């Protein structure tokens, strides 16, 4: 009975956070963003690291605003490894984000520690440290005022250290809530002749999701992601996915004031998942762009011995692979 009451409480918290995200009006996103964020949580929340049943490797590529020269292109490769004591985890993120004449590459190592907060729920705290390599080649751009001193064929190369943190509260394959700050260090990019070029600010990320069992073969998986940056509009993402027979995923997403999306995924094997999404812009960019494409590939490696105290039954899966998460 107590477990059932707590389950209803978490559902209420989940929908309340969605409402809070929609009603916020003073922030926005500056980190690379993803339509399939629910399968890519480790890229922006180190608290997620180590919460999976088996080690996993994920790769994602996003081509944004097709037909627009210099539009963003993002490539991410990440690893997520739960340690043998099942209370700690390690992760590695490598993200390359291209926009116009600039390329920014993030390399970060994450660590998390988790503990039980109830019989079924766990709380994980994580931190990541690393750096961002920024390259800006102004000779590749077309500018309104080409006579500016900084545009005389100059190339900027900078390294910026990064320190981030986050928490992830979850119950395996049922629900999750998380919050994170990708980088506490907010040094801007400056030039002596033109003052500030890029003014960096803290970003806050809030995420949540729930898995509803509709029947034995169908699951409903709503989720949200809110990105907040001081002084800019909110970036709110809502998604609804349906999982059929633990193998096929179909869904839709909406980014407020920005885009609507279609999502599809397929569990190729018990250890391989591939997902795809297409965004159609609902803002004025839709007149100039044919949309955005995103593809993700995940590999669940297993621990080699088929044992995991969090998953007593392997449910017909190969011995080395535990059941993949429904998140």
Language-model regions, residue ranges each:
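Subset of outer-membrane beta-barrel
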Residues: 29-327
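Bacterial Sec-dependent N-terminal signal peptides
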Residues: 1-31, 240, 326-327
